[in-house]
Amino acid sequence: MVRSDIRSYLTIAKRELCEAPTSWLAFSALLAWMFGLYWSDLFVFRLTTTSFEFLELRALWLAVEAVALLVLYFGLLRVLKHSSGVAVVAGTFLFVGSILVLFAPSGFAFDGMRIVGVVLTGLGGAALLALLGIRYARKGPKLLLVNVALALFVAALFDSILLYLPLDLQLMIVALLPVVCVALYVASARNNAVAEGLIDGSTSTEAVEVFTTNSTKINIIRIVALPLIVGLAYGLMQRLTSDAYTSGAAGVNTATIVSFFLSSVFIALAALFIDSRKLIKLVCFAAIPTVGIAFVMLPLFSDAREAAQAICIIGFNSFYFMVWALWAGDRAEPSLPKRFVLGLFVLVGAESLGSVLGVPVVAALDDSGSTLAVVSLVVVYLLLMAGIFSFDRSGTVDQEQQAVVGAELSGQIAMGDRDLDIWVQRYGLSARETEVFELLAKGRNRVFISKALFISDNTTRTHMKNIYRKLDVHSQ
């Protein structure tokens, strides 16, 4: 099964790389823009006003994004109906805001213009982030992580080239990245129009009601509790490593880019193991310790906070996008976009709040290594508990998803053999998998299928897992 999983994963990655590049390239452009404006020290001098420092303006940007996401949540139906138009408006906000931030003259008289630019980038960034995230979530957890990994890798590669360009060219490129992002998104929307049409309405109302009733508590954990903890810890990390941006160290940008590269590797591994319980081990024994080591060792990084920040970014990026994958795993389609935007609101809002709360924390530390270590241990403990509690209950939701999909497939196949042929052709099932698939849709269990088809239990299990993987339904 390991070889089969790897082959399936490589096939998916190759298909996304060759057949749907505009989708992840759009996100890559957005990530590269974020790095240029808010995640590097390239333009710190332009993101500083008389009254506000760089990190305070970045916290404002995150807060505006959170407010915009909350507004999107209540008007999401209209937004999705006119997604391309909304993307163009959001890209315009992002472009104009970037121009104001990067090219506004220095001085107190122009501080208001720069703050308006930050607000506009928050409004535009939130809309594009939500639209891209929802599109990936509709593809399922594995495809979401594959797209994110590709986008992170390309963004890191692009940013590494950006570092060596002249300052004026850097400013121009970063300002134009929102235009590139929107153009790629609109092109991707046209390419995916048919596919998204097939997805819309694919889950019956009864199935949605059963799903949302049985998994309310788990949804609260995944959409509210876990993003809240991750966001707060992320914002606090930014404050604790604030010296990385203000010390003028040449290595901060390189460290951030390397962390983006490594994050793409971690997320690609998560996509490989998303169908099994190994994902829990990957989160609990890779991402959490990575963040933990960075937090606990922060006192030792007093002269090299950029190194601690890079380690934290690797762990938190793994958390950040695995939380996205959890939301994508809840496949009750009518409520998926709203759940995603709500979770994103909590995540971004908590990150902004963590950055604000980090101000008194940093002031109280007063270079006290022991106090910093205590704060670090508390954060790591909360992340560990939240991660284990959330991921360890993923099996319950997966079983509910299989029941929902099974009920829906039963209704589809009951219409006739022609409908079965459509499902088989759409998902590329083999002849034996088709036989197993038909019995599964009729509600038969593994034992019955083994006896009916005269095959071993292990063979039946293998066929079932292959079917679940092709249909993007996750079985334990």
What does each of the following model-derived ranges do?
Residues E56-R78, F261-L269:
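Central cavity-lining transmembrane alpha-helices of secondary-active solute carriers
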Residues R3-S4, A32, G36-R46, V67, ...:
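Linker/hinge segments immediately adjacent to helix-turn-helix/homeobox DNA-binding domains
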Residues G140-P166, F340-G358:
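Glycine-rich segments within core transmembrane alpha-helices of 12-TM secondary carriers
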Residues M1-A13, K142-L143, A156-L236, A271-K278:
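Intracellular loop-helix junctions on the cytosolic face of multi-pass helical membrane proteins
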Residues A407-K465, R469-K470:
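Helix-turn-helix DNA-binding segment
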Residues L72-L77, A155-I173, A268-L272, L353-S370:
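Transmembrane alpha-helix termini and helix-breaking/packing motifs in multi-pass membrane transporters
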Residues F110-L128, A304-Y320:
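Hydrophobic core of transmembrane alpha-helices in multi-pass small-molecule transporters
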Residues G125-K139, S318-E333:
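Intracellular juxtamembrane helix-capping segments at the cytosolic ends
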